[in-house]
Amino acid sequence: MSAVESGSKVLRMKESDAQKLLAMRCHIGTRNQSSAMKKYIYGRTAEGSHIIDVHMMWEKLILAARVIAAVENPKDVCVCSSRLYGTRAIYKFSQHVGTSFHGGRFIPGTFTNQIQKKFVQPRVLVVTDPRTDHQAIREASLVNIPVIALCDTDAPLEYVDIAIPCNNRGIKSIGMMYWLLAREVLRLRGTIVRSVPWEEKVDLFFYRDPNEAAEEKAAAAAAAPAAEAEEGFGWVERNDDNAWEA
């Protein structure tokens, strides 16, 4: 029995949360596996992709949330994502939880070079992918910063203290994991209550291509005049039986 299952019933995974994880394919890993991630794998799909144990995923997510909630100053928690698909998710996570964040390329020396302008000394580091965020993890190991990481089935766990097994390559999967992590941190802090669903939509944690969003906005703007003209166009019947006018 896991620590979460044997502990408080409040922390146990609800059916609705399990459905969210499955719907966003958080449990579908890669076709490869690392020896360190083997214990988190439940099976394989017909296509050969590894299936991650959802219960172990939830257990590690709750553990990570408890660590983050225990940090007195939220700004002492740094969330990083060199992976493009995770930048929106870490921004929204930081907005709600109050942590600091670094999106895009991680500048070497951010944790180790004190003369650098963006030098910071966080107490906890959260990363989206141990592979793409390897520079941040390596620097954290040099200055004894605990690392929490979203780890796929092929992820290396060197210098990772808390590995949350999940699909860290899908846009919706990354967004869902950070949404759940933010919700659990806020619940542990007492900011929101468990009896009421969190009003924040998970869609806001999903990455959107700026070019795609601009194209949709332009298409909507172009369609607006046509729709207005169509609404203003009608037929008025005249007194004669066979005559109509616009």
From Swiss-Prot:
Give the UniProt subcellular location, in the record's own words: Cytoplasm
Recorded GO cellular component terms are:
cytoplasm; cytosolic small ribosomal subunit
What keywords were assigned to this record? Cytoplasm, Ribonucleoprotein, Ribosomal protein
UniProt cross-references to Pfam families, sorted A to Z: Ribosomal_S2 (PF00318)
Biological processes, Gene Ontology terms? cytoplasmic translation; ribosomal small subunit assembly
The Swiss-Prot or TrEMBL record annotates one GO molecular function as: structural constituent of ribosome
Q: Which domain of life is it from?
A: Eukaryota
Cross-referenced InterPro entries, in alphabetical order? Ribosomal_uS2, Ribosomal_uS2_CS, Ribosomal_uS2_euk, Ribosomal_uS2_euk/arc, Ribosomal_uS2_flav_dom_sf
Report the HAMAP family cross-referenced here: Ribosomal_S2_euk (MF_03015)
Q: Explain the purpose of this protein.
A: Required for the assembly and/or stability of the 40S ribosomal subunit. Required for the processing of the 20S rRNA-precursor to mature 18S rRNA in a late step of the maturation of 40S ribosomal subunits.
Quaternary data:
Component of the small ribosomal subunit. Mature ribosomes consist of a small (40S) and a large (60S) subunit. The 40S subunit contains about 33 different proteins and 1 molecule of RNA (18S). The 60S subunit contains about 49 different proteins and 3 molecules of RNA (25S, 5.8S and 5S). Interacts with ribosomal protein S21.
Q: Which family does it belong to?
A: Belongs to the universal ribosomal protein uS2 family.
Q: What is this protein called?
A: Small ribosomal subunit protein uS2
Q: Which organism is it from?
A: Leishmania major
